[in-house]
């Protein structure tokens, strides 16, 4: 076996001949990032439904009660059509996110929504649609196929980057939150139409510890 030695930091950096000013800026950025990460907080959320059972596919999100306005997302995510279903059946995204709707079926689909939060219409197509759809307002968007009525999915658009979807055990975790006060909200497709979105105020401290919260929803 040949000997292998790890070069020193000085040797490694000297190979790139990075200007000292730029190197200093990089080191400052890394140092600041380390501070930010070391003070990030996390919230672990357990959601139970009306029957007392753990509730999957719940949108869980935290809205800061103070601080600067949060930038909109510039991400693109997929909701595919396969087996004449939308997958996943529930998606939670931040305002500003683009969604592409690839059709991986052997038949064409006509994807649309009439929801106030986003009205759009993708005529019959196969494969990749020409352009993704931008979701620029918060709210719940119900999507369907104009050809196959059984195809329904939900998109919950939230005004914060701190969100997750509960797993099969009804659990979700929000990471990277700055210490402070938040409004913790939950949404599920089976909430009664007139029911308010469940919410509670929470406080997260500056530590690496995970704070646990339990939410009970009137949904099945």
List each language-model region with its residue ranges:
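Extracytoplasmic copper-binding redox domains, predominantly the cupredoxin/blue-copper superfamily
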Residues: 39-220
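N-terminal secretory signal peptides that target proteins for export/translocation
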Residues: 1-18
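N-terminal regions of proteins, emphasizing targeting and processing segments when present
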Residues: 10, 30-32, 39
